[in-house]
């Protein structure tokens, strides 16, 4: 079979999926349709915003389907009418069985972790939050239970100590596109071999979950270790960002603050009071954790833009400040 003879439907929504879709198209595969989320109102004018995947598909004149309900009979029949051989899913919704069982060659998904570790909605965030030094991407065939299907292939990448989740996201986006193309090549030339996720038990005896990130997940508990808090900030930056509330004897009390960049203070700290803010000179902010002190390098006060600590201090009046 030639690339142009393999009819593919691509299902995805965010920027993370676009690089893989672009690689599929530019390498001569036949993407007959794209499925993505409906346009959403955005901004003050509530103008409809197209998903990054839709924007790309429109630019390439690829038909776009935007179902509200993936079980809708009209949508399912429209999907079936394309006669696709294969579905490729990247950063999309959970698919009903009637959809993922449709193509004769199956439906494979690209997941941003080394499965079976970090099944769930936010694998990149949790790998950084947990202080991992390695992560990766996995392609696997869909089955009933989410993120549990047989593995086609995996590729790994290092997480550097200074990386935040945005850095790792971009690295995995590129690596994922390479793996998607490699997986399609195996399907096309008949060299595909899969392994159950249990085959990776020697390196992942207790798979960790990667649940969706909620506002409560992002709230900093200053009673935790300095390493834990530092990794939480890294794992949520630049979006959605770790946050805390200023409590002090001045005008900023009760204001929310987002924290984007931190650094562990290597000097020994004594008499720690978790949450206490300490202004060092005119340009540094330190906060006590349970076992050490964390320097806040970039933050955003509620209603203001994000800024370095020195700029924040020039405009902020802090009186016995604490973070809660």
Tell me the role of every PLM-derived stretch:
Residues 1-44:
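N-terminal Rossmann-like dinucleotide-binding module
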Residues 6-9, 83-87, 218:
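Short active-site oxyanion
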Residues 7, 30, 61-63, 106:
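Conserved beta-strand segments of alpha/beta enzyme cores
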Residues 13-16, 68-71, 91-94, 265:
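Short beta->alpha connector loops
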Residues 15, 26-30, 37, 86-209, ...:
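Donor/substrate-binding cores of folate-linked one-carbon enzymes
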Residues 18, 50, 72-76, 93, ...:
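Structural motif corresponding to alpha-helix initiation and N-cap regions
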Residues 41-85:
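N-terminal glycine-/serine-/threonine-rich beta1-alpha1-beta2 phosphate-ribose binding loop
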Residues 202-324:
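Internal anion-binding site segments
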């Amino acid at each position: 079979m030639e690339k142009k003879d393999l009819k593919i439907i691509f299902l995805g929504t965010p920027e993370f999926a676009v690089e893989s879709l672009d690689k599929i198209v530019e390498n001569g595969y036949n993407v007959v349709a794209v499925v993505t989320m409906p346009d959403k109102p955005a901004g003050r004018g509530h103008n409809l915003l197209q998903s990054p995947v839709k924007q790309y598909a429109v630019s390439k004149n690829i038909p776009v389907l935007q179902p509200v309900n993936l079980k809708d009979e009209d949508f399912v029949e429209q999907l079936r009418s394309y006669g696709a051989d294969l579905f490729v899913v990247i950063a999309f919704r959970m698919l009903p069985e009637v959809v993922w069982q449709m193509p004769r060659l199956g439906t494979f998904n690209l997941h941003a972790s080394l499965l079976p570790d970090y099944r769930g909605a936010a694998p990149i965030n949790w790998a950084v939050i947990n202080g991992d030094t390695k992560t990766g991407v996995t392609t696997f065939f869909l089955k009933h239970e989410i993120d549990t299907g047989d593995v086609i292939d995996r590729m790994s990448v290092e997480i550097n100590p200074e990386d935040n989740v945005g850095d790792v996201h971009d690295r995995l986006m590129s690596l994922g596109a390479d793996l998607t193309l490699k997986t399609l090549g195996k399907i096309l030339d008949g060299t595909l071999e899969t392994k159950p996720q249990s085959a990776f038990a020697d390196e992942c005896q207790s798979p960790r979950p990667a649940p969706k990130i909620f506002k409560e997940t992002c709230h900093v508990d200053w009673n935790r270790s300095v390493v834990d808090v530092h990794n939480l900030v890294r794992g949520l930056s630049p979006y959605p960002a770790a946050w805390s509330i200023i409590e002090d004897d001045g005008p900023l009390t009760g204001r929310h603050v987002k924290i984007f960049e931190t650094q562990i203070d290597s000097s020994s700290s004594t008499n720690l009071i978790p949450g206490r803010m300490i202004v060092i000179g005119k340009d540094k902010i330190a906060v006590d954790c349970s076992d050490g002190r964390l320097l806040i390098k970039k933050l955003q006060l509620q209603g203001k833009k994000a800024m370095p600590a020195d700029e924040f201090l020039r405009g902020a009046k802090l009186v016995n400040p604490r973070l809660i």
